[in-house]
C-alpha cells in the first residue's frame, strides 16, 4: 500500500510571517493526526527570501508535487487552508494537477473539504471567542470581514458564517458580514457591503465597533499595518473621532483551527462529505 503524502496548502503570501505560521499549523495538525504534514503554498511564497524563513525555502504546489513525484511518491492528500471553494481550488489547482498527470499518469490527489461547512460551527466559535476578547462595555456591533471573492459560493459561505456568529453571540449583538474589497461590476454585488462603506453608515460610524477578522494568516491584508487596518483607521478619521474600531486576532491564532483541520484531513482521507478526487 502506498503512503499518502499530506500537504497543508494555503494561497501563499510574500509576508514571511504567513509561511512561518503555515509551518507551525502543519506541525500541529501532523501531531494531531499522527502523520507528517508538509506546508505548501499555492503561489507567491517562494518570493520570500530564505533567510527570512529560517534558511528553509518555502515551497509552492506544482514544483512541490513534481519533486515528490520524481521520488516515486504518487498519492497525495491536500488539506486546503481556505474558507470556501475559491477559484484556486476549483479551477487553478485542478488544471495544474492535470498538467502534472500528463507526465505522471499514476498521480493520485484527494482534496479534503474546505474549512467552512454548514454542519460545523467551530469557525464561528473561533470568531466568537476573538470578538469576546475585544469587548468593551458598550460594544455590541460586529463587522465580520473577509477578503472578498469573485466566487459567489465563497461569499455565501462568509454570509452563513456570519449567521452562525450572530447565533453564538446572541440577540444583544448586531453582526454584519462585509468584504475588504470586490471586483467592479454588478455581477459581483454579492460581495457587498464593503467594510469601508459599512463603517460610514450612520448606524456604524460612531461608538465602538469590533471588526472580526475572517482571515487566516498575517500578510498584506491582515495584521497591524494591513489593508483592513488602514480601512479601519480611515473610517475612524472620517468620523471625526466618534468611531472606535477594534480588530480581532486572526483565525489561525486560535487552537481550535488545528482540530478543524485534523477533522478535514480525516474526512479527506476517506473521501467523506465535501472531499473529492482531483
Please state what every model-predicted region is.
Residues 1-278:
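Extended amphipathic ligand-handling, pore-lining, and cofactor/metal-binding catalytic surfaces
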